[in-house]
């Protein structure tokens, strides 16, 4: 071709490069000489040239070589082009008898022996391509001659001929609470579709019958197999499209041909692609999978093999070469005795020995491992190596010098054969399909097409097209690039060296960092990974069923002691532990926490004590330590010193450090262990993980107390003790063997009282445990067969009866009954010293008894008592489960001590019982008493302010001379005013005096003196010396009182106003706040009663404390200078992130609280405040004058007015609809709070509609009223009464109702569009009448449109308009007319407005014009007119409103912009504004008009009401809920009730708030009364009344209250109670008592009268005022509900009545009976006056006045009773009353000292008089 003229025919002439023909022979088509590619045509033995002219040393070619070892007797063409004589070998070696494609005796479609690719080498008897009858097998196994040669589709599969392929599916699996989708495989062969009709036994029987009892090779060649497994069958006239054959190559489909006839080329019966289950069918390689072969075959089976590796005989290669060895099938295993798989190789497709198709341990291409380039492993599929795969090689892909050489030019092996059967010599670069396509660089080897190849060390070769190249080979088809010599020597010589090198590279690949466990396995073994991924892998199954190592709250296993998982001698670091753990397991360490490599653990190795040692009480009852003792979390788990050297890997110490049993009893410490305590406790866990674990344990994260309390080791210890003790069977079956437990009666006594039936019934049974507590069961208890060991568990601070609830009997049976439980040793633990608090005073201070009572109440028990001496907690239970005190209960309620924990130095404690004396200094000033000491001395909270931003002055050295007096524990905490004074630098004592002088409302001077002590004079230096920071004890005032003794002691002075005596206070163990003990400088001592008011230290060594104020920032730092400037992006610090922003607080009635600038108002006073003097004349020392400036940290309270004040007309818009609503509502008073419900029906709709229709014109001009009018008239049209329907006698049909509603809705549409239409017509009537006509049409005003068209001369248009209401045919004719205009392009000459009318008349909303324009009928129309067009013109006249609405929705909701032709239903305030509404985030709630929502609700009864009632669908004001609320009530009347409770609440609360802001709070109550929930309704109404009820009586307030009580039926008591709250706020006690009485709160009214009003009335003798209150409270039905009525109110009332009775007696003569009755009343008062409670000095004054007055009354009454003669003129003399009748009553009266002295004087005189009279 390349060295000859181009005139040579396709097959003739001498070829290039010295050959005789271009492609082999000098022949044309049909001659008997050379083939297409240099050979004879399918088997001739001509010595012809190659493709490019190379001469061949051996005959052979692509399709016709003699490689099949058959003699060639004639020549033929390559593809059968031309004649052929004699016999020749075809592609696959069968004998042909002279065939030709075009000119032989057998034509192409009826030949006997076809050639080519139809039937390669088959011998047939007759038949053509489409209808031949074949009797012998072709290389594809067909008996008939189509391309793929299927034979039969009728044979059913017998046995397991099809490889098992598990069907896959999907399923869901829940893991860790998360549901995930997983893939499943059904591992059963009967689950396959092919075998679903058979059982396992049937399949096994068929396999036995077919002699399939072992592994079957699925690929080996057999006799007469098809291309893809079809077996041959004898049939006649087989054709590609119409044959009668029954076999198909691919086994697809059914037994039909491709064009509907009986069979097809793809329609065999047995299913799979690569080998079917038919015994008769054959696969690609001449045998089905799993069948043994008995005869050799040619063709694509390339040298027969047995099934999947079984031996076969007489195998050949692709072109007939006998193979050197006989390894496995296509994908099968390699054997030692068989070859002939896919392409003449001995193993899998790519050469790997396999056990079967896809078996475990192999891949598709036969690889064992996937290695990198350049490595050599046990197997690697190079191309063309030892008895190879697809291209003759066995090992995996290695692109380098190898012991196995490749057919791709990478070295071949001696025994391997190439794809086309050539047998390369030793040490050659063999042939193959690779880069050296067809070349063989080796010892005399022929190429693919017969070319001579140079040896590896030979002369220069030729290139692809004759180009010379160094040591290169000649290639075909351009693949002949020069190949470098890879192995210049024999590759086998370097095999050992390569193996060693590959081993090193492999080890470096898999372990690049050596044996370090940290970097182990960076690259996982693919084979191992594939094995792990298989579900049948045991490791995978174990990992699936094994729980994870760590859980959030792992529950400790029952009685499982942690074991050491490692030996103690190992010095291995824990840093890399756990990195190489492949799979989890359920070993003992599964639940043990492992050290985290992310935590830095610093061990303290110096064993030094961080804190001073604290003495502990070693008690058996001590509870486990909960806080660290000298750094250790649990003292009883502390390690000894020698354990510090223990290996850290010991899990015992590791687990015990992080987990402990919270119920476990502490280990008693021996003296030896106590001696090591300091050393063991020094091992401080100074890590975060330890702190976290401690916090977790402290918070109870190790498990609930109920769980851990049962499953601890104390129960096991008890059981062990039971087993070791001697066990004797009790006669009644009672079991109690636990050590320490006892019963009352004892077990022996119980045995004695057991009856003959073996029953033991005992009364008042008690079971207890020594030192822990007992349980007392009252009544008869049946103890028969009770195992008390398992039932009763009494432990420290808890008791459990019936651990297992399943075994618990019903309440009242067994021990599950009422009982009294006593738990001993229940004391709290001091969190500082870890000692038990046993002091009764300490227990009382922390209110431990109250805490136990609260715990008892929480557990359902009844608290009885607590005995601090023994720590006994007694409570009663009604039934049993578990009761006790947990650690969380002890920490639940923290009672801070009355003093702060600022610890100071202490002085020695004086001996008990020593009299405390005050020492006097030389200048007469008293010295402080000796100071005492307690284990922990704390400074008083009154002295030290604990403000967060105050400088801690307690850390500074305290002067030694500063002293402080002894203060009892119950000292009151520091007051807020004291802190404020200290922060401002003011003397706190001075501030208290100033506050007391200004607020002298209830406390007199005595009370202030009692609280603050003596008022020092200006000249008194004691006040100057004494620091204002030091507290002045309340006890000093009591100590300084002069106690009046003897007969003249005043009961008034000795009442409840005295502080406890000094002796009582000395008995306490005081917590002192003193600093040091100052030595006395005075030799004199003064007794306690003569002490001064308060003590001060000596002035000589005194160094007074300075009043240190809180160092606050005086002003606001500018933002630029602040440390927070520019740090607003620090999201993790909320303070920096928020910066100086503040929260805006909204109050009631539009009140706004903010800390920024004022929104309005003047700032005139800013920075202009004049400093004022703060001198006060009564203060001992004036405070320095300070200027007051406005604080930068202030809060502004402003009332915002969103709008101007409403006019009366505006208020009518609020009131009128509400009045209409009230008119059509019903008030239910079934409950205390009335409920208002709407009347069902549509009457309220007509009421609203009539109101808006009759409103004044100026009111209707308001936009909001316009919209209200549209809404109510639409409701009337949709749901209201229609005259047409009401006039009918019978019930109208549904069709008539729908039609009438349509007409009413049409009228509404016309009415709403009328104003806009009139405006448009007035503008376009003259200039553009067509537009005016269209405007009339949008309002359904057809007659006016016709008239206008006639007036403008457009008569034809008028004629068309008159037919709008006609039939559908008019619209169809107009549509045809528009189509004709469009076709003729005449519409371009018609005005757009006229076309718009025509489109409207034709019922086309959008019409496409010929000029690529559109006519949109709905353009520039609002949504209501657009909807009207759809209803009137685009739909039939009978269409309903719902259908028109649906069509309109499609017009504006279409997803495609081009399909949208109508505007959305925007609210009226947005229509025409030009605003473009953006897409809402929530597509379910678009912004649409309320009328549209009403139409949707009419169409769909279940339409959502939330968006309908949205204020934005009505008005631009989002807070205007007027129409929304009224609409909701109307819909409720129509039985639309599917609004959520939350939305309903928001609606009602918002509208009520709106009314409240307008001043219509009484109507807001009306709105609240519609709430269905009675509790919420009452609360809302009461809160509203409290905010707005006024004390002043005005006509307006009276009218509102009348409206509430009469029309809304609100209880009047609620209004009075609200007024009482208002009076309390204004401190008007009189009105507060009055309204409390009216509200029915008798007890509160009585308390207020007695405490604040009675004293003033008694002192001022305003008896009628006080009597008015008390007599109203006196009736029994009221007084019985009043607390302390007998000792308070009734005493005052009786006193007033006695005075009135005395006045009446003095004015009118009275009988002796009245005097006797009066005497009884007076004597009763004498006994009860002292019972009146006194709260201040005014109460005591009133009490004393009453006492003196009653004493005089008693004298008068007695004198009247003892007058000698009633008729005499002598006046009664009170001084002559007998002493025996007067003295007992006078002595009971609580009179002050002066009154008492006066009475004593009188009684003395009477006594002396009686003595004198008696002596005479």
UniProtKB/Swiss-Prot annotation:
Modifications made to the protein after synthesis: The N-terminus is blocked.
Q: Where is the composition biased (Basic and acidic residues)?
A: 525-534
Return the GO cellular component terms, semicolon-separated: kinetochore; nuclear body; nuclear envelope; nuclear inclusion body; nuclear membrane; nuclear periphery; nuclear pore; nuclear pore cytoplasmic filaments
- EC number(s) on file: 3.4.21.-
Q: Active site located where? A: 881 (nucleophile)
Q: What class of enzyme is it?
A: hydrolase
Q: Annotated site (Cleavage), which positions?
A: 880-881
According to the record, the residues making up region (GLEBS) are 157-213
Record region (FG repeats 1): 1-156
Matching entries from InterPro entries are given as: Nucleoporin_S59-like, Nup98_auto-Pept-S59_dom, Nup98_auto-Pept-S59_dom_sf, Nup98_C
List localization entries: Nucleus membrane; Nucleus, Nuclear pore complex; Nucleus, Nucleoplasm
Provide the positions where the record notes the PTM Phosphothreonine: 670, 1069, 1771
GO BP terms in the entry: mRNA transport; nuclear pore complex assembly; positive regulation of mRNA splicing, via spliceosome; post-transcriptional tethering of RNA polymerase II gene DNA at nuclear periphery; protein import into nucleus; proteolysis; RNA export from nucleus; telomere tethering at nuclear periphery
Annotated region FG repeats 2: the residues are: 214-480
Q: Mark the residues carrying the PTM N6-acetyllysine.
A: 603
Its record classes its membrane topology as: Peripheral membrane protein
| Positions with biased composition (Polar residues) | 670-682
Where Phosphoserine occurs, residue numbers? 524, 608, 612, 618, 623, 625, 653, 673, 680-681, 839, 888, 934, 1027, 1042, 1059, 1063, 1328
GO MF annotations for this entry?
molecular condensate scaffold activity; mRNA binding; nuclear localization sequence binding; peptide binding; promoter-specific chromatin binding; RNA binding; serine-type peptidase activity; structural constituent of nuclear pore
Among PANTHER family, the record links this protein to: NUCLEAR PORE COMPLEX PROTEIN NUP98-NUP96, NUCLEOPORIN
Quaternary arrangement and interactors, per the entry?
A: Part of the nuclear pore complex (NPC). Interacts directly with NUP96. Part of the Nup160 subcomplex in the nuclear pore which is composed of NUP160, NUP133, NUP107 and NUP96; this complex plays a role in RNA export and in tethering NUP98 and NUP153 to the nucleus. Interacts with RAE1. Does not interact with TPR. Interacts directly with NUP88 and NUP214, subunits of the cytoplasmic filaments of the NPC. Interacts (via N-terminus) with DHX9 (via DRBM, OB-fold and RGG domains); this interaction occurs in a RNA-dependent manner and stimulates DHX9-mediated ATPase activity.
- Family, per entry: Belongs to the nucleoporin GLFG family.
The UniProt function text for this chain reads: Plays a role in the nuclear pore complex (NPC) assembly and/or maintenance. Involved in the bidirectional transport across the NPC. May anchor NUP153 and TPR to the NPC. Plays a role in the nuclear pore complex (NPC) assembly and/or maintenance. NUP98 and NUP96 are involved in the bidirectional transport across the NPC. May anchor NUP153 and TPR to the NPC. In cooperation with DHX9, plays a role in transcription and alternative splicing activation of a subset of genes. Involved in the localization of DHX9 in discrete intranuclear foci (GLFG-body).
Could you tell me what this protein is called?
Nuclear pore complex protein Nup98-Nup96
Organism, scientific name = Rattus norvegicus (Rat)
Q: Which gene encodes it?
A: Nup98
